[in-house]
Swiss-Prot record:
Gene Ontology cellular component annotations, sorted alphabetically: cytosol
Protein name as it appears in the record: Methionyl-tRNA formyltransferase
Residues where (6S)-5,6,7,8-tetrahydrofolate binds: 113-116
Keyword terms, alphabetized: Protein biosynthesis, Transferase
EC number: 2.1.2.9
The protein's enzyme class: transferase
Source lineage: Bacteria, Pseudomonadati, Bacteroidota, Bacteroidia, Bacteroidales
Known role: Attaches a formyl group to the free amino group of methionyl-tRNA(fMet). The formyl group appears to play a dual role in the initiator identity of N-formylmethionyl-tRNA by promoting its recognition by IF2 and preventing the misappropriation of this tRNA by the elongation apparatus.
SUPFAM superfamilies: FMT C-terminal domain-like (SSF50486), Formyltransferase (SSF53328)
Reaction(s) catalysed (UniProt annotation): L-methionyl-tRNA(fMet) + (6R)-10-formyltetrahydrofolate = N-formyl-L-methionyl-tRNA(fMet) + (6S)-5,6,7,8-tetrahydrofolate + H(+)
Amino acid sequence: MKKEDLRIVYMGTPDFAVEALRQLVEGGYNVVGVITMPDKPAGRGHKIQYSPVKQYALEQNLPLLQPEKLKDEAFVQALREWKADLQIVVAFRMLPEVVWNMPRLGTFNLHASLLPQYRGAAPINWAVINGDTETGITTFFLQHEIDTGKVIQQVRVPIADTDNVEVVHDKLMILGGKLVLETVDAILNDTVKPIAQEDMAVVGELRPAPKIFKETCRIDWNSPVKKVYDFIRGLSPYPAAWSELVSPEGEAVVMKIFESEKIYEAHQLPVGTVVTDGKKYIKVAVPDGFVSVLSLQLPGKKRLKTDELLRGFRLSDGYKMN
């Protein structure tokens, strides 16, 4: 079968999912339909906002479905009428069997980790938070349990000590697009040899990648320098690590922290103590040193570098982070 004859249905929603779709379209593959999340109001004006995948699909005049429920009979029938040979899922949602089992060649997913590591909703964040020096991208066939299907292909990607989650996300997004094409070609040429995840060699324990909530993002200043540093970059720029900045009078304000620096220095200060010159730097005491805050944001304000914030916000010794 030629690639032009292979009928592909593509499912995805955020920016991360646009790259693979773009590479499929520009590569001359036959994308017969796109499925994305329903439109949602966003921002202060609650204006209806299209998902990045929908925006791209409209630009390319691709047929589009936006089901509220994936088991809805009308949606399932519309999907069936596209007569897909293969379905590709990138950053979408959990599919019911009636959907993933429909195409004759199956449905494969692009997952932003080296499965079986980091199964779950936030694999890129957790790899950086945990201080990993390597992650990767995986294509695998869908089956009943989430992120457990047979692995088709993987690509490894280094994580630099200075990388935040945005940098790693963008690396994986580009490589993921290429891997989707390679996986489609392997399926077309019947050269796929899927490997069960339980048969794959794993170094160390399996780590999950659960969804991240606001409380997940609160900084624990009782952690070592390196752990706090990794935590901040693993949540930067979104959803952002945060802490309560408490004044000597006991007034607290939530502060988001986007960028930091490690300082290994012995001290006798209580954990969470803020050390500042009021002009250039803010350091927070942790058990084995300090975390220097380089970029931050106060409620209702824009993100600023520390010296910019200190020009308009009076901060002195006596403050602490909670």
